[in-house]
Amino acid sequence: CHFWIGLCLALAPAGAWVAISADTTGWESILGVESNTWIGRDFAWFPELFFISMGVALWITAFDVNYARMDVEVDRRQGIRSFPATFGLKMTKGLSIALTLGWSICFLFAGLSGHTNVRDYNYPLWIPSVILMGIVNLYVMTSQASKSESSSLDMEKFQQLLFKTSMMTGWVLLASLSFTEGMID
């Protein structure tokens, strides 16, 4: 369930890209092919869009897995097999770390995969933004998650911090791209 939500939301960047690029490239934007021959195919959406979509999938999955920590006992009573209810909080913490490292790496690769000199401007803002938000998310999902297990009030504080951190991640990354695009124009 957690991975499904992440994958569904990962379609948003791909859908936006198709909507924008279909005006200029037509069916090639959907097929992802820049040439009409099978020899020497270039996928227009790879690697930048691929890494952005994968990053979104892992980022949202990491958030949702941690958000499910709040309902572990209810999930177990009702037979819902969320990741934390099925595998426990220790495995949830390990998965959260792996997912956060995964989305950070995907977003870093997206920033490093530019095809033109114009995209080289992503380095000054995109890479530090990804690293900063990856570190902040890791901090929340590790040290703050451990503190949340003592009481329901602590769990509520953790959930609020988790939500704000995850939301802020999106805004910081969007702002770094917007500022970069503004510098280019």
Residue spans for each PLM region:
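Multi-pass alpha-helical membrane architecture of UbiA-family
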Residues: 1-185
